[in-house]
Design a protein with these regions (language model features):
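Conserved GNAT acetyl-CoA-binding A-motif
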Residues: 102, 107-119
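Conserved acyl-donor/pantetheine-binding loop and adjacent beta-alpha core of acyl/acetyltransferases
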Residues: 29-85, 93, 136-142, 147-149, ...
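Conserved acetyl-CoA-binding loop-helix of GNAT-fold acetyltransferases
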Residues: 88, 94-107
Length: 157
């Protein structure tokens, strides 16, 4: 078994079955099952879902969307990534798999926006994301130009 790596997940029935493992682990706001079901096309390679397999099973996942322009409230100009619903199965938490997913997004060298869910603010702080408060909610942003040393070759996916 090789070292786990981040890979784009196919939108198919196998991935749908893998997502069901996460259903009882997290809050409803982290569920991707319905989102996947709505987009299911057998083996679609343009999936917004990324994950880490370990021992043949999906153990961590996230959604990653490219957005065209952040605009005023987001403090981002130009294209950026929205990272949603990062989740690691309980048995595999605190082993660096969540950080591997985030580093995958960072190595694309676009600003990354995310919402800290379920007491995860410390996680985003540790990964050099900056908190931003606006009238319609709080979120975190990582800017590649201000974090040039935030990713080392050993950390990137």
């Amino acid at each position: 078994m090789g070292f786990p790596k981040v890979e784009r997940l196919l939108i198919n029935y196998k991935t749908l079955d893998e997502f069901k493992k996460f259903k009882g682990c997290g809050a409803l706001e982290l569920s991707m099952l319905e989102e996947l079901q709505a987009n299911i096309i057998e083996n679609n390679s343009e999936s917004p879902f990324y994950g880490i397999y370990y021992g043949g099973s999906l153990i961590a996942r996230m959604s990653l969307y490219m957005k065209r322009n952040g605009g005023e409230p987001f403090e981002i100009t130009g294209p950026y990534l929205e990272l949603y619903k990062l989740e690691v199965l309980p048995t595999f938490q605190k082993q660096g798999f969540g950080q591997m997913l985030v580093n995958y997004a960072k190595q694309l060298q676009f600003p990354v926006k995310t919402i800290a869910r379920i007491h995860s603010a410390g996680f985003w702080d540790k990964l050099n994301f900056q908190p931003v408060s606006v009238t319609n909610g709080d979120f975190y942003i990582w800017h590649p130009e201000t974090n040039m040393n935030a990713i080392t070759n050993e950390e990137s996916a």
